[in-house]
């Protein structure tokens, strides 16, 4: 029996919605990354984007364990000498509620054109409403 290899035009994608209220950041991010990659499907193929679309609502209510609200740091650089900026998880959640989850998921995906295509299937919203009701997403419990 030959090894099965999925073709890009044969992949069927589902839409899922995850409510992140009082969920731990890393646990949500790892499950989202797994589903974006398509590893939960029997037809998973490493070189083909077989993943599903994921909608995360209530991203502003994500939690982290321990003292990471103050201790976890995010860094960025302006490109100029001495132009490094750091932000804590708490400040990031106040200012950009979905960005911490996006950065966590992006770090778990491949760093190649296929990974960049996968991250585009992630939709993160700070509140409970989202504009994707026409796709009839299924609720996914984590």
From Swiss-Prot:
GO terms for cellular component: cytosolic large ribosomal subunit. Keywords: Ribonucleoprotein, Ribosomal protein. Coiled coil: none annotated. The keyword Ribonucleoprotein applies. Pfam families: Ribosomal_L13. GO terms for molecular function: mRNA binding; structural constituent of ribosome. GO terms for biological process: negative regulation of translation; translation. This protein is one of the early assembly proteins of the 50S ribosomal subunit, although it is not seen to bind rRNA by itself. It is important during the early stages of 50S assembly. Part of the 50S ribosomal subunit. Belongs to the universal ribosomal protein uL13 family. This is Large ribosomal subunit protein uL13. It comes from Burkholderia mallei (strain ATCC 23344).
């Amino acid at each position: 029996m030959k090894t099965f290899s999925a073709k890009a035009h044969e992949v069927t994608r589902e839409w899922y919605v995850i409510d992140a209220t009082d969920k731990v950041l890393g646990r949500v991010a790892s499950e989202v990354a797994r589903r974006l990659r398509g590893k939960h499907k029997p037809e998973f193929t490493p070189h083909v984007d077989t993943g599903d679309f994921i909608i995360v609502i209530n991203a502003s209510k994500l939690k982290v364990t321990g003292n990471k609200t103050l201790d976890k740091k995010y860094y960025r650089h302006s490109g100029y000498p001495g132009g490094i900026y750091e932000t804590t998880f708490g400040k990031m959640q106040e200012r950009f509620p979905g960005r911490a989850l996006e950065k966590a998921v992006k770090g778990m995906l491949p760093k190649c054109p296929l990974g960049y295509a996968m991250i585009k299937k992630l939709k993160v919203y700070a509140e409970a409403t989202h504009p994707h009701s026409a796709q009839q997403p299924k609720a996914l419990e984590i």
